Amino acid sequence: MKKASLVGAFFVSIFCSLQALAFCPSPGTLPLVGVAKVVDGDTLRLVDGRSVRLIGINTPELGRDGRKAEPFAVAAQRRLRALVEASNGRVGLVPGRESKDRYGRTLAHAYDEQGRNLESALLAEGLGLMVAIAPNTALVACHRRAEQQARQSRLGVWRKLTPRSTRAVRQGGFALLQGMVERVEHNRGGYWLEMEGPLVVHIPPQAFSAFDLAQLPRLAGKTLEPRGWLVDRRGRAGTGQARWMLRVTHPAMLGLPR
């Protein structure tokens, strides 16, 4: 029975991945570039020396500096490597509107030889979480569908992953959270959604165009499922302010109630 269950899960994973490959089709014929190395589940090193951080996905971290790999980190790396190999070691790239990150890596969407999006394939198998960081949000809708498919089927990280309570925030890094909005503040620095526990979600002014601003004050009392990178403000937050901050630049990262 257990073997049958595993076999069934395997075919569900393959079926979901095949569906997801059609979620974000290539915008046209792309020049293909060689991949020298799959660094991890969301980073490639090209033969021309560039490092490429895939847009729209955050995969589990590999072990380094004495830390163990996060669950499914190795699986994500292996799956991305397999997708690249199936594309004869070459990918097409569509750079984001913001083309570099703070580490100097190229920010881009990657496609195989058939024009199928690699991020959506990984998301549909539950090998990463969707992220939406303005201005690189062109494929948010199809990436969300791919993730939702994996979540509903409990694939990959979604077998055990559940949102952590905002009351339980204790360390930085990427997190999927859940909690109630206690209060919404607005000032020159943006909108501040004060959550249960030691967390505030910050929407900066430059991101306002992506949000329905009239709806933000009405989120007080609602439960959200925000995700993103937690910043420790200890020593910088004022008296009575939350220690932890999560900066959001697109509504998809808020986990708004449906």
Model-predicted segments: where are they?
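Small beta-barrel nucleic-acid-binding modules, primarily SNase/OB-fold domains
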Residues: 18-258
